[in-house]
């Protein structure tokens, strides 16, 4: 099993798809890496030679910020927004949508499941 950037890539998948299992690498970046290193995108991970694995590993480590480093950077960016008191930081702190989406209805992904609030009780008729 090929281990790149601390991730075990699935053996049966094509390299092009397997690289997307690494946080920070999508399909476009995966194709870009393979083109630069000269590895065929159709090769299965189990058929990669040690030399190809090492070239992929080096290309990713030198060029891109992936996995833990990228997660830390994203977290620090969000923390910075909160610390400077930016509106976006405030939305992150409150757990609401950050990019201007409506919140009267929807926004359930950010807000979590509905919390039922006891409303007004109906008056009984006599």
UniProtKB/Swiss-Prot annotation:
The keyword Transmembrane helix does not apply. GO terms for cellular component: cytosol; small ribosomal subunit. One of its GO terms (molecular function) is tRNA binding. The gene is rpsM. GO terms for biological process: translation. Keywords: Ribonucleoprotein, Ribosomal protein, RNA-binding, rRNA-binding, tRNA-binding. Residues 92-126 are annotated as: Disordered. It comes from Deinococcus radiodurans (strain ATCC 13939 / DSM 20539 / JCM 16871 / CCUG 27074 / LMG 4051 / NBRC 15346 / NCIMB 9279 / VKM B-1422 / R1). The keyword Signal does not apply. Located at the top of the head of the 30S subunit, it contacts several helices of the 16S rRNA. In the 70S ribosome it contacts the 23S rRNA (bridge B1a) and protein L5 of the 50S subunit (bridge B1b), connecting the 2 subunits; these bridges are implicated in subunit movement. Contacts the tRNAs in the A and P-sites. This is Small ribosomal subunit protein uS13. InterPro entries: Rbsml_uS13_C, Ribosomal_uS13, Ribosomal_uS13-like_H2TH, Ribosomal_uS13_bac-type, Ribosomal_uS13_CS. Pfam families: Ribosomal_S13. Part of the 30S ribosomal subunit. Forms a loose heterodimer with protein S19. Forms two bridges to the 50S subunit in the 70S ribosome. Belongs to the universal ribosomal protein uS13 family.
């Amino acid at each position: 099993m090929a281990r790149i950037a601390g991730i075990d890539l699935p053996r049966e998948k094509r390299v092009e798809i397997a690289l997307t299992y690494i946080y920070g690498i999508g399909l476009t970046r995966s194709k870009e890496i393979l083109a630069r290193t000269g590895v065929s995108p159709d090769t299965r991970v189990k058929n990669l030679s040690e030399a190809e694995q090492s070239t992929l590993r080096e290309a990713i480590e030198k060029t891109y910020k992936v996995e833990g480093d990228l997660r830390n950077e994203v977290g620090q960016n969000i923390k910075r927004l909160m610390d400077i008191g930016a509106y976006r930081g405030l939305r992150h702190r409150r757990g609401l949508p950050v990019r201007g989406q409506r919140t009267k209805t929807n926004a359930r992904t950010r807000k979590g499941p509905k919390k039922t609030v006891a409303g007004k009780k109906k008056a009984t008729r006599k």
